[in-house]
């Protein structure tokens, strides 16, 4: 089980997320290379709304299937891992009087040299977290990777 140097799923999802220009070209290139891609934005004081927004966007864009449990479950774990980075391990937002404004990227595909390894999913989050008062937030980042 060797990672393919040019198919590191976490790295690719982070680069897609942070790339501020030529977004459509980058998505087209990833899709040509066999990746399924989703980008979006979410802001909330509730972590469950962040999770729901990522899941809904991933289903609408075809990154995961709407029916069945396995793909949603893998996405959930990757999203929770990314949220741990954003919230520094404290998965609470509104109850701690903090809010997030995030851009997200979801990438699905096989990062390994062997096709037998199957698909993996990566969720990258970047944006701000802080008190629900404009100007009192700071940057935050998180990434999560899980097998499907």
Curated annotation (Swiss-Prot):
Gene3D superfamilies from the UniProt entry: Hut operon regulatory protein HutP (3.40.1510.10)
Keyword entries, A-Z: Activator, Histidine metabolism, RNA-binding, Transcription, Transcription regulation
Any GO BP annotation: positive regulation of gene expression
Pfam families hit by this protein: HutP
Highest taxon listed in the record's lineage: Bacteria
InterPro entries per the UniProt record, alphabetical: Regulatory_HutP (IPR015111), Regulatory_HutP_bacillales (IPR023552), Regulatory_HutP_sf (IPR036482)
GO molecular function: mRNA binding
Job of this protein: Antiterminator that binds to cis-acting regulatory sequences on the mRNA in the presence of histidine, thereby suppressing transcription termination and activating the hut operon for histidine utilization.
Family: Belongs to the HutP family.
Identification of the protein by name: Hut operon positive regulatory protein
Protein's organism: Bacillus velezensis (strain DSM 23117 / BGSC 10A6 / LMG 26770 / FZB42) (Bacillus amyloliquefaciens subsp. plantarum)
This protein's encoding gene: hutP
